Regions:
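N-terminal helix-turn-helix DNA-binding core of bacterial DNA-binding proteins
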Residues: 2, 6-44, 65, 72
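Aromatic side chains
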Residues: 31, 57, 73, 83-86
Length: 96
C-alpha cells in the first residue's frame, strides 16, 4: 500500500471535502453553501480554499448581487485532473 502517491494537498480531510463537493456538480459553489455543507467556520474554510486556489486547483469569482457580494468557487481543469488522479490512486490502494 503506497500512500506516498496520494496528493497530500487533497488528502487533508477538509480539503478532500471541498474538492469532493466542487467535483460533484457542474455549477459553481457559493461560499456560504460550501460552509453549510462542510460545517466549517468562515476562517477555517477560507484558509483551505486559499490553499487550493494557490495550488491552481480551484478558482473563485466575487459577484455583486442582491445584498452582500458572494464568492463563487469551482475546480480548474488542473484541479479536476488532480482530484481524478487522487481517486485513481485511492482505488488502486483499495484494490479496486
Amino acid at each position: 500500500m503506497d500512500l506516498s502517491k496520494l496528493d497530500k494537498l487533497i488528502h487533508e480531510k477538509a480539503r478532500l471535502g471541498i474538492m469532493s463537493l466542487l467535483a460533484s456538480r457542474a455549477e459553481r459553489w457559493v461560499f456560504q453553501d460550501l460552509k453549510g455543507e462542510l460545517k466549517m467556520s468562515d476562517g477555517n474554510l477560507i484558509t483551505h480554499l486559499r490553499t487550493l486556489e494557490n495550488a491552481g486547483y480551484l478558482q473563485s469569482e466575487k459577484i455583486d448581487g442582491v445584498g452582500r457580494p458572494q464568492t463563487l468557487y469551482e475546480l480548474t481543469k488542473a484541479g479536476r485532473k488532480a482530484f481524478e488522479d487522487y481517486l485513481a490512486v485511492l482505488e488502486k490502494i483499495l484494490g479496486r
